């Protein structure tokens, strides 16, 4: 007669996963692929997007159920979100997966991870929240809720180490996806840019508030640069039709005569093709560094938001290239310093190929290598170790 333990030993490796947005779906799919390569009969179940489902993850709920942004939207959906979390707690407790992996979505996942850990289920939080930058006390909640944090960046691991929270630096999936030496000629050919053209990328952000706050200053900066470089080509990749419409309206008000190339998507190709970029901070700055494109970061927010941020944020820089290097590798012009003349003064030498550009690209390459560690594989290894496999 089979015992419970012998039945358990026959059960395939079972991994619970929750992804709450598209970026998490991409990470989840990569993790599932890497795990299936090692354990072909493994079972994956939880909240998944289309990419994770295509890799064989069984979806108890669709990812869109969790993908809500903004306080008003979250409040409107709160009863449903709480009901889903309660149901998931019950179902995962009954299933007892070998490991539960919460992918990003910290406000939803970390509480759930804590409940599952209390019930004897091993938990991983994949993608560190920015606890090193602000609301640092969250690290204690994360430490109680998880057996392991998987971090993209080395300074994140250093932060968790200070608080004795188990953390593994796995490198960044974007660094894995992008070549160490991007092909500028190919990118220019794709975009129809001549090899000898001088090219500037403007990336005023992906959120409505960013495009509203930054576009006018960015366009005025391009106008100033055109005085020095009359044949300057200006490319603006926009994430969707709404942001394009918004940017076009602002351009019509601020710089109707300025000739710019508006492109749907293709931000990465534009970064690779460009001689310099002016961008909002965020993931775009990391992507631009990996594209080996010199950049200036310009950022504005509402005065009260900035006042609060200055008091809450504990880091000397806002952009990832600077946080990775521990110095102001990339010029950051924030709030009242984010004005066209100052931005243009910083960008002009980059566009003209000053001596600084070669050294900057070498540093970008060094930083790229430091976070290019095959993150999917590293994440899979961490899951298997925690599962005792």
From Swiss-Prot:
The keyword Transferase is assigned to this record: yes
GO molecular function: lipid-A-disaccharide synthase activity; phospholipid binding
Leader sequence residues: none
Gene Ontology CC terms, in alphabetical order: membrane
Catalytic activity: 2-N,3-O-bis[(3R)-3-hydroxytetradecanoyl]-alpha-D-glucosaminyl 1-phosphate + UDP-2-N,3-O-bis[(3R)-3-hydroxytetradecanoyl]-alpha-D-glucosamine = lipid A disaccharide (E. coli) + UDP + H(+); a lipid X + a UDP-2-N,3-O-bis[(3R)-3-hydroxyacyl]-alpha-D-glucosamine = a lipid A disaccharide + UDP + H(+)
Keyword Lipid metabolism: yes
Keywords: Glycosyltransferase, Lipid A biosynthesis, Lipid biosynthesis, Lipid metabolism, Transferase
Enzyme Commission numbers on file: 2.4.1.182
Single biological process term from Gene Ontology: lipid A biosynthetic process
Pfam families: LpxB
Pathway(s) annotated for this protein in UniProt: Glycolipid biosynthesis; lipid IV(A) biosynthesis; lipid IV(A) from (3R)-3-hydroxytetradecanoyl-[acyl-carrier-protein] and UDP-N-acetyl-alpha-D-glucosamine: step 5/6
Functional description taken from the UniProt entry: Condensation of UDP-2,3-diacylglucosamine and 2,3-diacylglucosamine-1-phosphate to form lipid A disaccharide, a precursor of lipid A, a phosphorylated glycolipid that anchors the lipopolysaccharide to the outer membrane of the cell.
Stated family: Belongs to the LpxB family.
The protein's name: Lipid-A-disaccharide synthase
Organism listed in the record: Photorhabdus laumondii subsp. laumondii (strain DSM 15139 / CIP 105565 / TT01) (Photorhabdus luminescens subsp. laumondii)
Gene: lpxB
């Amino acid at each position: 007669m089979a015992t419970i333990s012998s039945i358990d030993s026959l059960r395939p490796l079972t991994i619970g996963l929750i992804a709450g947005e598209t970026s998490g779906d991409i990470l989840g799919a990569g993790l599932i692929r890497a795990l299936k390569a090692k354990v072909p009969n493994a079972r994956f179940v939880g909240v998944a997007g289309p990419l994770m489902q295509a890799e064989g993850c069984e979806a108890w709920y669709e990812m869109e159920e969790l993908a809500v942004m903004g306080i008003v939207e979250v409040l409107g959906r709160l009863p449903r979100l709480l009901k889903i979390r309660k149901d998931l707690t019950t179902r995962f407790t009954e299933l007892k997966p070998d490991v539960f992996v919460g992918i990003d979505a910290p406000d939803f996942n970390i509480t759930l991870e804590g409940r599952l850990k209390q019930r004897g289920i091993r938990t991983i939080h994949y993608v560190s929240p920015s606890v090193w930058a602000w609301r640092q006390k969250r690290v204690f909640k994360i430490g109680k809720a998880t057996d392991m944090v998987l971090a993209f960046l080395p300074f994140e691991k250093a932060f968790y180490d200070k608080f004795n929270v188990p953390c593994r630096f796995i490198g960044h999936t974007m660094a894995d996806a992008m070549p160490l030496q991007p092909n500028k000629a190919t990118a220019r050919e794709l975009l129809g840019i001549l090899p000898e053209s001088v090219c500037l990328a403007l990336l005023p952000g992906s959120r409505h508030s960013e495009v509203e706050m930054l576009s006018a200053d960015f366009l005025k900066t391009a106008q100033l640069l055109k005085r020095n470089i009359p044949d300057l080509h200006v490319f603006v990749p926009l994430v969707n039709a709404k942001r394009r419409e918004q940017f076009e309206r602002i351009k019509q008000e601020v710089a109707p005569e300025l000739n710019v190339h508006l492109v749907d998507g293709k931000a990465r190709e534009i970064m690779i093709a460009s001689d310099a970029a002016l961008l909002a901070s965020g993931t775009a700055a990391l992507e631009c560094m990996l594209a080996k494109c010199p950049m200036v970061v310009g950022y504005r927010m509402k005065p009260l938001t900035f006042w609060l941020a200055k008091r809450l944020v504990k880091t000397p820089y806002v952009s990832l290239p600077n946080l990775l290097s521990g110095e102001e590798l990339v010029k950051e012009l924030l709030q009242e310093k984010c004005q066209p003349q100052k931005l243009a003064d910083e960008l002009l030498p980059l566009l003209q190929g000053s001596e600084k550009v070669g050294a900057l690209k070498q540093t970008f390459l060094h930083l790229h290598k430091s976070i290019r560690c095959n993150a999917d594989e590293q994440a899979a290894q961490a899951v298997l170790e925690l599962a005792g496999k």
